């Protein structure tokens, strides 16, 4: 696991809880993960957000470029991961996930793996 396209709504509660969940699931490996939110560039597209973010995650793997959290200046309290602030980062991504958390508890995590075949 190299990259997470976070749900990342830039709200204190969501970002703090998502960061905590990433640390809970990945333990010490969380420090090695690149985490960004494509919503920082597109805004929240409501029902279309999950689909677009899945495409962005797959394209990040295919092109070896992690999209930035473009507008991040100061992460909130409890948000201490590598949020790829400011500009994109070249990186080989073997496995990535895209988080999508919907209103009313409809939540999904899609896992993508690079295919070299």
Where would I find each of the regions flagged by the language model?
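Conserved "HGTGT" condensation-loop signature of ketosynthase/thiolase-family condensing enzymes
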Residues: 2-117
């Amino acid at each position: 696991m190299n990259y997470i396209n976070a749900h990342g709504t830039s709200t204190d509660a969501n970002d703090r809880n998502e960061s905590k969940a990433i640390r809970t699931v990945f333990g010490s490996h969380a420090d090695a993960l690149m985490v960004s939110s494509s919503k920082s560039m597109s805004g929240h597209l409501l029902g279309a957000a999950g689909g677009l973010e899945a495409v962005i995650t797959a394209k990040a793997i295919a092109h070896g470029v992690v999209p930035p959290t473009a507008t991040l200046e100061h992460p909130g309290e409890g948000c201490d991961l590598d949020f790829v602030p400011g500009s994109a980062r070249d990186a080989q991504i073997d496995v990535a996930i895209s988080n999508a958390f919907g209103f009313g508890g409809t939540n999904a995590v899609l896992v993508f793996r690079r295919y070299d075949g």
